[in-house]
């Protein structure tokens, strides 16, 4: 009998050769019903995996990330199977599970439409009802290439040829459909809930993300274990469409994109007002937190990028130019320039901690298919900061940065959790340095009572990091802020300080961003607030709406009074009906609508409507100004 150690530490005995599903059944029928796979000694496997030695096993359900991936990966194979049944001359690309669903890439002559998606979904449901067993098969390299050659699957052959000579070629088969895949998968197609499955859209995708390769058709889908979960997800998608920043950006006249500069946003006046408010807030908070601000050039020479490592490891994402027969690059990151600024002076241990921040414009060559409004652009502004310190100051500085991040996100109403990424297999720096840094990160998070997830071995080779995952108003997660201990750049740029002993030492360096990219953070705010910015951020804080031409002069006086108090106010002078003007202001998400007519002119008042509460009655201009200023000042 084998001894199987379960997640709760208990030990279960089971016969050798039993599979994971047998183990789940021996624990409880409910667990067996919910099981979709398992982790055996940390490796994710399917329910058919045989157990032949003592091991640790964690049974996975759909609620586990790895279990959800198994379920949706099987869904993607059913999608590919259905497409192969319905259309001739189909060549398969890849079909992985992704966050909230799955996709599969196809090379086929037929251009897929919404009606095709309905037909494909019906065929998928047939395959599910057939409850075809899903079998794992292993082939020799030559056998696999020959098999896929006979099937005309050129892309699969390319993938096999990219594998190592001795690597196991694994495939999964259901009925007459077979696919190159490492798995794992569910035991049969019938394990997918056919009423909780949907196909969402078709998009173009270059093979292997290379715009010089074939354009494939990518079908996106999702699947759940309950119909109610699918319905909730579709509802969230509909809500997300209403909040889509590209749609609202156009409606609110915030920004635009043009073919003359693909992937680079053009900010309009309304958008610049919001951006500048974000920057002003950033500068105020950083001054209070003891940061210096620097600015470094956008174009720097090849030697710098070779020294930083970007020339060798990031070149495909960079833009280049030649000046006076010398190679230069447009900066994709601010960090190397900040290292040059540090090296311009000699620092003493008494100067630490040294906090240096920069709002630097960077450019990165993203593939056109990956661009997505402000969320994925080719030019953006990073709010980088580098903190140089003594080893004894690490924990205190980490706490200071986390406090600053928390301050920012609380102002915007974001909840968040943290992911801590630890030392990978290949890393620079001693175990002692890494352990000290990781323990400092953990200590600060626990001291602050911040929940965090540990991603073992997922840190960069040059240091551990924590990522802040924001949760927006409709429950989506976004990664923005990162706090990274960097052991690499201080070495590459030979950063030093004079210690108490009079000798040169290497400083500890933290690299951090809070907004991340300001433009991307702006997009998140648009969607988070659904365009209804809080008063301090709103491009137009008030609009004055005269009922008739005879009220226009009074409207102009009010506008001047508000503007003189620093309130962003516009006068609607259009020759339109009052109802139209009010509706238009509501569509433009203006916080305050101030209507003026005969009574208001006579009494020197305004009739006030707010975006959230509608008509709130008549107020004097002075009273309203005081209320607006208090609301602006009370931004947090």
From Swiss-Prot:
CDD domains: TGS_ThrRS, ThrRS_anticodon, ThrRS_core
Domain called TGS: residue spans: 1-61
Cellular compartments annotated: Cytoplasm
Chain spans, region Catalytic: 244-534
Primary localization: cytoplasm
Domain of life from the UniProt record: Bacteria
An individual GO BP term: threonyl-tRNA aminoacylation
Keywords for this protein: Aminoacyl-tRNA synthetase, ATP-binding, Cytoplasm, Ligase, Metal-binding, Nucleotide-binding, Protein biosynthesis, RNA-binding, tRNA-binding, Zinc
SMART domains in alphabetical order: tRNA_SAD
Reactions catalysed according to its record: tRNA(Thr) + L-threonine + ATP = L-threonyl-tRNA(Thr) + AMP + diphosphate + H(+)
Cofactor(s) of this protein: Zn(2+)
GO cellular component, one term: cytoplasm
GO molecular function: ATP binding; catalytic activity, acting on a protein; metal ion binding; threonine-tRNA ligase activity; transferase activity; tRNA binding
Keyword field contains Ligase: yes
Cofactor note: Binds 1 zinc ion per subunit.
Keyword ATP-binding: yes
Binding sites annotated in the UniProt record for Zn(2+): 335, 386, 511
E.C. no: 6.1.1.3
Similarity section: Belongs to the class-II aminoacyl-tRNA synthetase family.
PANTHER family for this protein: THREONINE--TRNA LIGASE, CHLOROPLASTIC_MITOCHONDRIAL 2, THREONINE-TRNA LIGASE
Subunit structure: Homodimer.
Function as written in the Swiss-Prot or TrEMBL entry: Catalyzes the attachment of threonine to tRNA(Thr) in a two-step reaction: L-threonine is first activated by ATP to form Thr-AMP and then transferred to the acceptor end of tRNA(Thr). Also edits incorrectly charged L-seryl-tRNA(Thr).
Annotated protein name in UniProt: Threonine--tRNA ligase
Species of provenance: Natranaerobius thermophilus (strain ATCC BAA-1301 / DSM 18059 / JW/NM-WN-LF)
């Amino acid at each position: 009998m084998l001894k199987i150690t379960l997640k709760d530490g208990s030990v279960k005995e089971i016969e050798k050769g039993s599979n994971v599903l047998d183990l789940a059944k021996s624990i409880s029928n409910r667990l067996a019903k919910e099981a979709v796979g398992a982790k055996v000694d940390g490796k994710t496997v399917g329910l058919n995996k045989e157990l032949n030695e003592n091991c640790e096993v964690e049974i996975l359900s759909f609620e586990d990330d790895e279990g959800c991936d198994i379920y949706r990966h099987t869904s993607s194979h059913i999608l590919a199977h259905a497409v192969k049944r319905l259309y001739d001359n189909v060549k398969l690309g890849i079909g992985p599970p992704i966050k909230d669903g799955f996709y599969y890439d196809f090379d086929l002559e037929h251009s897929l439409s919404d009606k095709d998606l309905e037909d494909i979904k019906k065929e998928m449901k047939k395959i599910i009802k057939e409850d075809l067993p899903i079998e794992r098969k292993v082939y020799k390299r030559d056998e696999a290439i020959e098999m896929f050659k006979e099937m005309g699957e050129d892309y699969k052959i390319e993938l096999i040829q990219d594998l190592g000579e001795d690597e196991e070629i694994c495939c999964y088969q259901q009925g007459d459909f077979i696919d190159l895949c490492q798995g794992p998968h569910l035991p049969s197609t019938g394990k997918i809930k056919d009423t909780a499955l949907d196909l969402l859209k078709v998009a173009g995708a270059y093979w292997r993300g290379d715009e010089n390769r074939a354009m494939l058709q990518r079908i996106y889908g999702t699947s759940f274990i309950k119909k109610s979960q699918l319905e909730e997800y579709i509802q969230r998608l509909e809500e997300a469409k209403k909040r889509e920043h590209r749609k609202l950006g156009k409606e609110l006249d915030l920004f635009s994109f043009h073919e003359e500069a693909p992937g680079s946003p053009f900010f309009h006046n309304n958008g610049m007002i919001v951006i500048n408010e974000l920057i002003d807030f950033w500068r105020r908070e950083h001054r209070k937190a003891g940061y210096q601000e620097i600015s470094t050039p956008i174009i720097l020479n090849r030697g710098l990028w070779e020294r930083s490592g970007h020339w060798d490891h990031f070149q495909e994402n960079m833009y280049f130019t030649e000046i006076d027969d010398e190679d230069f690059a447009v900066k994709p990151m601010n960090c190397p320039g900040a290292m040059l600024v540090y090296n311009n002076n000699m620092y003493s241990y008494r100067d630490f901690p040294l906090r240096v921040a920069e709002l630097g414009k960077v450019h990165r060559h993203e593939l056109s298919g990956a661009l997505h409004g402000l969320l994925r652009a080719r030019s953006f502004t990073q709010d980088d900061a580098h903190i140089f310190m003594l080893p004894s100051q690490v924990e205190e500085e980490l706490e200071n940065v986390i406090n600053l991040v928390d301050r920012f996100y609380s102002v915007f109403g974001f909840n968040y959790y943290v992911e801590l990424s630890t030392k990978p297999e290949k890393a620079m720096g001693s175990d002692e340095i890494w352990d000290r840094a990781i323990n400092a990160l953990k200590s600060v998070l626990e001291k602050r009572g911040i929940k965090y997830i540990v991603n073992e071995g997922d840190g960069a080779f040059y240091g551990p990091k924590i990522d802040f995952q924001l949760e927006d108003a409709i429950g989506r997660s976004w990664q923005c802020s990162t706090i990274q201990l960097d052991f690499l750049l201080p070495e590459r740029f030979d950063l030093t300080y004079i210690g108490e002993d009079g000798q040169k030492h290497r400083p500890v360096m933290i690299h951090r961003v809070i907004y991340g990219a300001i433009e991307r953070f702006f997009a998140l705010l648009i969607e988070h607030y659904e365009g209804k910015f809080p008063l301090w951020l709103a491009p137009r804080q008030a609009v004055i709406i005269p009922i008739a031409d005879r009220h226009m002069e009074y409207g102009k006086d009010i506008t001047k009074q508000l503007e003189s108090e620093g309130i962003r106010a516009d006068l609607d002078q259009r020759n339109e009906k009052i109802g139209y003007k009010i509706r238009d202001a509501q569509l433009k998400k203006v916080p305050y609508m101030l209507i003026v007519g005969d009574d208001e002119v006579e009494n020197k008042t305004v009739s006030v409507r707010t975006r959230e509460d509608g008509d709130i009655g008549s107020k004097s201009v002075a009273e309203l100004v005081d209320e607006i200023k208090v609301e602006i000042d009370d931004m947090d």
